[in-house]
Amino acid sequence: MQSHNSFSINLNQQKSLAKKRLKAIRQNDERALQQVKQFHTQPEKLTTESIQLADVQHALARELGLPSWSKLKAHVEELEFHKLAIHNREQPLDAELKTLHVRCGHDIQQQLKTCGFEGEFLPMIDPLCIGPIPNDETAFVAIRAQYVVDMLLPVMGREGSVQDIALSEQNKINTLLDEQFERIVFWVEHDTYDQFMLLRGLTLLEDTEGKVIEIIEFNQFPGTERFIGFGQLPAEAVRSCWQHRKAVTSKLRSQAKRCWQALISPTPQSLIELLTQHELDCLPNIKAAMKRHLQELPHSESGLSFTQQLALEALAEHSTPITVKDWFQEYQEKEPLPTLGDVMFYALLLPLTCSDKPLFSIDSLQKNWWEQQVCITEHAQACLEGSQPITQNYWVGGMQVRESNLWVWDHNQLSSLSHKEW
């Protein structure tokens, strides 16, 4: 029977699958052999005659995201241990200190309760991966609240005041800084949403002393589908992550501060310097996140951000309209570092419909946003080809993209990044 979760691995299933693949290979199934070779560390040595069960098991473990079959077995046993601990309602893992669990969303809030954690949960949901990141702390919350009201709430068909959004965010900051908590644990993945929330959180905690501050950080997890975030994981897997937390050291704080200062800079030079000249070993996923962040600057030929480019390329594959829901899913498959939720995605794309020559059409704004049908335009095709580039006005962190102050590049080589003045 198939596992209910792509990250709950059934060892007996994998043993059976390995035997079936070996049998198929022995019967000259070239496709099965190539599948094993794709993940084996020594594919050149594998032939129909020489391959052994251990080879198939080794490749299968690597396909699931583990280095060896023995590591796979250990991983499965570990998750079984945590599943039993949850079933037996063992003492909470965070019981020894009054703990605040910080996350950039609500996805694991219930899971933490299921796992038996007793600490409080703080969702810091302001998506710093999109919109302006102000360098003025006194105006930071208000500016971000204005962006949420202007760009995100309309997509959802919701109304809200800047004051209410700002108050909610300030209350979250107050909770983060609350002296009652003896330990703060950040749960983060490798994308820009999580990484920038972490930088923001550590910046806010810069003067905090006498607390344990820790990070649980993952960029992959063994399973049969692509790992995007903790929300995909079963409860026992979430519980197992606890043992991998790391302490926030003075060195990590220093690196985080440097990254934050680069992020709020009005030009990209500081980010480029960080990426090319500095070791950021305490923040293993920040460089990839920073580069992906820079890819939101316009492409030198099309004028599109990388998100817009990928989205329009996905839409260009369809000759008939598709729903926004399907469009987002297809974009996600192309995205090398999935970050955006569906609302954020659509908010970044909608401005492309507001010019004299829209890049995609919408059948009806009266529908729920995820049911709206979208279709690419001829102008978008020309834009993607570079023959009709567009100019836009938007924010990428501390950088304002506008025609009079334009940073563009090929979204590949940082050395191609250049400044255009009109």
Q: Predicted segment positions?
A:
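Short, conserved secondary-structure transition motifs
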Residues: 215-243
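Long, hydrophobic/aromatic-enriched structural stretches that serve as scaffold segments
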Residues: 155-207
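A structured, charge-rich N-terminal accessory region that forms the first stable segment of a protein
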Residues: 87-159
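Intrinsically disordered, low-complexity eukaryotic regions enriched in glycine, serine
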Residues: 1-84
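A conserved mid-domain beta-alpha-beta active-site/ligand-binding segment of alpha/beta enzyme cores
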Residues: 235-316
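Charge-enriched amphipathic alpha-helical scaffolds
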Residues: 309, 332-364
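Short acidic, hydrophobic short linear motifs in intrinsically disordered regions
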Residues: 320-331
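C-terminal engagement modules used by replication, chromatin/transcription, nuclear envelope/ESCRT
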Residues: 355-422
